[in-house]
Swiss-Prot record:
Annotated keywords: Magnesium, Manganese, Menaquinone biosynthesis, Metal-binding, Thiamine pyrophosphate, Transferase
Gene Ontology terms, MF aspect: 2-succinyl-5-enolpyruvyl-6-hydroxy-3-cyclohexene-1-carboxylic-acid synthase activity; magnesium ion binding; manganese ion binding; thiamine pyrophosphate binding
Protein's gene: menD
Pathway in which this enzyme or protein is active: Quinol/quinone metabolism; 1,4-dihydroxy-2-naphthoate biosynthesis; 1,4-dihydroxy-2-naphthoate from chorismate: step 2/7; Quinol/quinone metabolism; menaquinone biosynthesis
Protein name (Swiss-Prot/TrEMBL): 2-succinyl-5-enolpyruvyl-6-hydroxy-3-cyclohexene-1-carboxylate synthase
Amino acid sequence: MSVSAFNRRWAAVILEALTRHGVRHICIAPGSRSTPLTLAAAENSAFIHHTHFDERGLGHLALGLAKVSKQPVAVIVTSGTAVANLYPALIEAGLTGEKLILLTADRPPELIDCGANQAIRQPGMFASHPTHSISLPRPTQDIPARWLVSTIDHALGTLHAGGVHINCPFAEPLYGEMDDTGISWQQRLGDWWQDDKPWLREAPRRESEKQRDWFFWRQKRGVVVAGRMSAEEGKKVALWAQTLGWPLIGDVLSQTGQPLPCADLWLGNAKATSELQQAQIVVQLGSSLTGKRLLQWQASCEPEEYWIVDDIEGRLDPAHHRGRRLIANIADWLELHPAEKRQPWCVEIPRLAEQAMQAVIARRDAFGEAQLAHRISDYLPEQGQLFVGNSLVVRLIDALSQLPAGYPVYSNRGASGIDGLLSTAAGVQRASGKPTLAIVGDLSALYDLNALALLRQVSAPLVLIVVNNNGGQIFSLLPTPKSERERFYLMPQNVHFEHAAAMFELKYHRPQNWQELETTLVDAWRTPTTTVIEMVVNDTDGAQTLQQLLAQVSHL
């Protein structure tokens, strides 16, 4: 009997089972202990293979692939700290709903806690963050193949969102020629090998429930808050709110077209919040709200009813409103709760939104971070998509820009970390094949600099704008102690990215004005390669411009 041959047959069953649940993209890091899984993935023609040498980046690459494909994405890593590097992407997926399947190779039990190399306690290491955790036994023909495949089917068949951790111990030898070891064990699955369905099929979860009193509430004064959702859902939500005559407060990730732009500016005006107090019901569609003033209003509002509709399970209201938590696909929910044509009830807010946008436009000429955030809608590629980083840049775009309705926007706004942003953007581009504009800050780019290797392989133009304000300038918006702000919060690195781009053979530009930026973008959208654009800006102008606009709009 060949141990290495049976390891591969065991792994082949695992990988084939994944294909029955829609897995097409599989991300693989180098490693020896994961050899059975890697070779099984390589031999399965159903997979699109992605590789990366950095497991943390690999996890985020998978996250980006899952965001666009809406299907589970598998990740294969070797044992040891390689596994721990998947933690950030797993946490993000659990909060934003992407499906990740983490196949982590492991040492067999006799090599754990005895000083063996690269052997750590992997079962349960992700605590409560996976939706399911499976600790497989060492491959053995004493366990029927039907147990293995049905165990995986049960975990994936009930997976609605988040990650599944499948820990896979393999004993040595890991290498060797294939022989007939385990063929009869595999063949006991019969015609499952020729089928395309799971061995064990779980019943789908029940459909959305209709709120029987909706016909009563839709006649009231309502407010629609739009958080993270798909581009198609964003367009439907905008039309739904318009028909109802309810003001729509659209987050940067809502893709609703933000019909009342600059919400995070005008929500700082007492006239706006006073008018919103008249709302009898607030319907929040989607989670992960960005704007500080929006979150403050959301926490303080006291309507008669507060409904939150999102496909993700769990509590999504940090203000703990009394109301209804409705777990449903947003598009399906809208169909069950049709709008009734009514006249808009808000008067002040549309006026304030227009005046706020005019205040922003009046400052658009300076070559700066806030101005780029406002102009970003002018620079979007046709039939493309936008990936927005975290920290200051996403807040500036949320507050100062108005993105087109239905234009795809992606970000990591679950745990809102700055790790893995370039890797996630790479996954977003690969899964869609669309031209992609990604925008991040300098610290975010430094944090995930390894991911420039992933950006060498794109199928359409990708432009990465690095806004270099020399540190974490978001802390300039917070009451951090001035005496320690630079050393312990901003942490300026005084670096530029020309040599990083050159190391990975990526195009690089550092425009000095809007005309140079626009010329660079025109050229970049013509070729299916990555272009790194470093926009060096004054350290504090972005934060200061936002604060000045907030003060100005609050007194309108």
